[in-house]
Regions:
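Catalytic cores of nucleotide-enabled group-transfer and carboxylate-activating enzymes in metabolic
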Residues: 7, 16-19, 27, 83, ...
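Glycine- (often His-adjacent) and acidic-residue-rich active-site loop
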Residues: 50, 58-90, 109, 137-139
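Hydrophobic/aromatic residues within transmembrane alpha-helices
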Residues: 56, 68, 116-117, 174
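Structural motif
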Residues: 57, 104-105, 134
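C-terminal long alpha-helix characteristic of the crotonase
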Residues: 124-129, 171, 176-202
Length: 202
């Protein structure tokens, strides 16, 4: 298991046979900056060579609020295209990971953070989890595959409502609509049980 460097935008540790990748930032909001996206791609490429069940999680109040808008608006057109490709590369690395991947989500899961959660094979969330994609309200639309993945999970009409109207939804509606697999008081512990069970059955 590759160690996370000091000051890295995430930590990586093991609980038994399960790897836990925890997004970290000083403000706890876990923005998906270009540097963070590249670091996540690198670590996923490393652990794919000897895959074990993986949980991706964040802080108590934020899974991730998505891209850093200040960084986004400063991008040139070529740089924006490159960032879009990097985001797609990250989501594909998660979706194609050869062992079970579960997002353990507390609090806000927004924008690119929602894209990341959608790329995971399973999603277990706290009762206070909130989901949304506010890009359309800011004149932006995700280029990271979230539109397609969300449509497959909850249907085109509901996905359009979330993306075009920038509508936020809570944990219970997310469960009823099929966006998430389970609501739990302790998403991390529930995720540990789930990926262990799925890995045993694989």
């Amino acid at each position: 298991m590759p160690p996370a460097a000091h000051g890295a935008p995430f930590s990586l540790h093991r609980v038994g046979e399960v790897l836990i990748l925890q997004l970290e930032s000083d403000d706890g909001m876990n923005r998906l900056t270009r540097a963070r996206v590249m670091a996540l791609i690198d670590v996923l490429n490393q652990i794919t060579t000897d895959p074990e069940p993986l949980i991706i999680t964040g802080s108590r109040k934020f899974f991730s609020v998505g891209a850093d808008l200040e960084e986004i608006v400063a991008l040139t057109a070529p740089a924006a295209y490159e960032f879009s490709r990097l985001g797609q590369q990250l989501m594909d690395a998660v979706a194609r990971f050869p062992a079970p991947v579960c997002a353990a989500i507390c609090g806000y899961c927004m924008g690119g953070g929602l894209d990341l959660a959608l790329a995971c094979h399973y999603r277990i969330v706290s009762p206070d989890a909130i989901f949304g994609h506010r890009g359309a309200a800011l004149g932006l639309i995700t280029g990271w595959g979230g539109t397609q993945r969300l449509s497959r999970l909850i249907g085109k009409a509901s996905a359009l409502q979330m993306f075009v109207a920038a509508e936020k939804i809570g944990a219970q509606y997310a469960l009823e609509s099929g966006l998430v697999d389970q609501v739990a008081e302790d998403p991390l512990q529930a995720a540990l049980r789930l990926v262990r069970d799925r890995h045993t059955l694989a």
